[in-house]
């Protein structure tokens, strides 16, 4: 599976600059609203040093890391649901994303205009969330009557209709669905086919200046503002510069800015964590590769990510943890140390498992 994250935010908050840094693209990043009109899609490799080590051990010809797809859409303004700015039709471009990354301006720069005339992260987040809520309300207002008719003639799911109405009530209260789903015991699976934006996990990406990046206290204030959602802090312009540098130069620049991890790596890591994802590894002479699965997936489900036939034909899996294989230096030595196991259909995969699946016809 490929993880897809939709990037939203007001105009001029640094969305396109961040997207350029993420993807190495050069989409228009301008100092005026609506520089991005058509959605930009980019696929980003997830950094994983384990793959380099696996390629060394197995003599792999190539390395294939797990990937994240990012979709950058036009800036949203207050009143978009009623046609302000470019309206909200382009939100359809991110409805199938697994998560929403909301980019929030947290930097002062008189040369970069703010669409509302002032830098106010709380107000900006409220504007975006309100527009996403209104977009979801429009979707539910169309879906509920159709499902009510289906339920009346015994062709619809009454429990699903209840969930639709409960979600509508949450939105009418001015809240995102994801923020209250747990407390309301909402069955999110009933909403899946609607691809509601506010039912997706949120990540808040604060495009910040040095005053915030160097202050744990200020970062904590913003974290508290968005909790229980995850927050990422970065300087989009710095991130764009980092991707132009060598690995060593980038590390030095990060250290100069008091950071031990780039914002892009942080965003990818948080995206995985937010969605409950992990990776397992495969390796051989041709390639060393990372595969994305959900935490809690079984060995057959993991095999199915490679090919659906592998899940159906799963017999067993030869498994060794990356840590044990790294220490052993070869599969032969890992086996000699008793670190390689044969696992069956009920085995729950662990992050960093190195696997060789045995598949029947």
Protein language model regions, located:
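C-terminal-of-GTPase-core extension/linker across diverse P-loop GTPases
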Residues: 2-8, 13, 19, 146-348, ...
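Conserved G1/Walker A P-loop phosphate-binding module
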Residues: 1-111, 141-143
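Residue-level signal for pocket-adjacent positions within structured domains
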Residues: 22-32, 39-41, 49, 53, ...
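Glycine-rich, phosphate-binding/catalytic loops in enzymes
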Residues: 36, 86-87, 117-120, 220-223
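Short, flexible surface segments
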Residues: 96, 350-351
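Short, intrinsically disordered, mixed-charge
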Residues: 24, 56, 92, 96, ...
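Amphipathic alpha-helical transducer elements in NTP-driven molecular machines
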Residues: 34, 48-51, 64-70, 84-98, ...
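Conserved Switch II/interswitch segment of TRAFAC-class P-loop GTPases
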Residues: 42-47, 74-84, 95-157, 170-184, ...
């Amino acid at each position: 599976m490929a993880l897809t994250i939709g990037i939203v935010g007001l105009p001029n908050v640094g969305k396109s600059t961040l997207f350029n840094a993420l993807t190495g693209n050069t989409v228009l990043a301008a100092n005026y609203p609506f520089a991005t009109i058509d959605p930009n899609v980019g696929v980003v490799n997830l950094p994983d040093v384990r793959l380099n080590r696996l390629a060394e051990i197995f003599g792999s010809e190539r390395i294939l890391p797990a990937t994240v797809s990012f979709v950058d859409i036009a800036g949203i303004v207050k009143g978009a649901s009623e046609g302000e700015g470019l309206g909200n039709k382009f939100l359809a471009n991110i409805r199938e994303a697994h998560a929403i990354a909301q980019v929030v301006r947290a930097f002062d720069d008189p040369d970069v205009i703010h669409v509302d005339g002032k830098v106010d992260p709380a107000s900006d987040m409220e504007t975006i969330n309100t527009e996403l809520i209104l977009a979801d309300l429009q979707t539910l207002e169309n879906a509920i009557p159709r499902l009510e008719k289906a339920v009346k003639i015994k062709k619809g799911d009454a429990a699903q209709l209840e969930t639709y109405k409960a979600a509508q009530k949450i939105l009418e209260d001015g809240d995102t669905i994801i923020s209250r789903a747990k407390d309301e015991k909402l069955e999110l699976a009933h909403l899946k086919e609607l691809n509601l934006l506010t039912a997706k996990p949120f990540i808040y990406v604060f495009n910040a200046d040095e005053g915030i990046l160097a202050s744990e206290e200020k970062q904590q204030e913003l974290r508290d503002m968005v909790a229980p959602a995850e927050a990422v802090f970065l300087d989009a312009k710095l991130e764009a510069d980092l991707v132009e540098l060598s690995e060593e130069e980038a590390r030095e620049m990060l250290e100069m800015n008091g950071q031990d991890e780039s914002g892009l790596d942080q965003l990818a890591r948080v995206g995985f964590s937010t969605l409950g994802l992990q990776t397992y590894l495969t390796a051989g002479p041709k390639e060393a590769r990372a595969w994305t699965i959900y935490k809690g997936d079984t060995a057959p489900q993991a095999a199915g990510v490679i090919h659906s036939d592998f899940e159906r034909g799963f017999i067993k899996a030869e498994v060794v943890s990356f840590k044990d294989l790294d220490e052993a230096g070869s599969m032969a030595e890992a086996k000699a140390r008793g670190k390689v196991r044969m696992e069956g259909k009920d085995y729950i995969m662990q992050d960093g498992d190195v696997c060789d699946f045995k598949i029947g016809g």
